[in-house]
Amino acid sequence: MKLRPLHDRVVIRRSEEETKTAGGIVLPGSAAEKPNRGEVVAVGTGRVLDNGEVRALAVKVGDKVVFGPYSGSNAIKVDGEELLVMGESEILAVLED
């Protein structure tokens, strides 16, 4: 199934983070913090401005992004994979090589 976000929404696949501390202790899933990085897998058509124009989003599919710890509270499962849906304004930065 394909997910197509509306307007200024973005769908992000959360990056897998190491669940081991610097000292080598493996953390159980409940104790590990969820990563605040991910890859954009789908973007909406853009933000609708007050005058009716649509402004394209600054992020694109494939971008690696950083978001806040409480961003993307709308987690959904698609084909067994958990994806985050958030507004573009919740994305803090794009990671570049």
From Swiss-Prot:
Complexes and interactors: Heptamer of 7 subunits arranged in a ring. Interacts with the chaperonin GroEL.
Family: Belongs to the GroES chaperonin family.
Pfam family, one: Cpn10
Compartments, as annotated in UniProt: Cytoplasm
Record CDD domains: cpn10 (cd00320)
Superkingdom of the source species: Bacteria
Keywords: Chaperone, Cytoplasm
A single GO BP: chaperone cofactor-dependent protein refolding
SUPFAM superfamilies per the UniProt record, alphabetical: GroES-like
PANTHER family, sorted: 10 KDA HEAT SHOCK PROTEIN, CO-CHAPERONIN GROES
CC terms in the record's Gene Ontology section: cytoplasm
UniProt organism field: Pseudomonas aeruginosa (strain ATCC 15692 / DSM 22644 / CIP 104116 / JCM 14847 / LMG 12228 / 1C / PRS 101 / PAO1)
Gene Ontology MF annotations: ATP binding; metal ion binding; protein folding chaperone; protein-folding chaperone binding; unfolded protein binding
PROSITE patterns noted in UniProt: CHAPERONINS_CPN10
Protein name: Co-chaperonin GroES
Described function: Together with the chaperonin GroEL, plays an essential role in assisting protein folding. The GroEL-GroES system forms a nano-cage that allows encapsulation of the non-native substrate proteins and provides a physical environment optimized to promote and accelerate protein folding. GroES binds to the apical surface of the GroEL ring, thereby capping the opening of the GroEL channel.
InterPro entries: Chaperonin_GroES, Chaperonin_GroES_sf, Chaprnonin_Cpn10_CS, GroES-like_sf
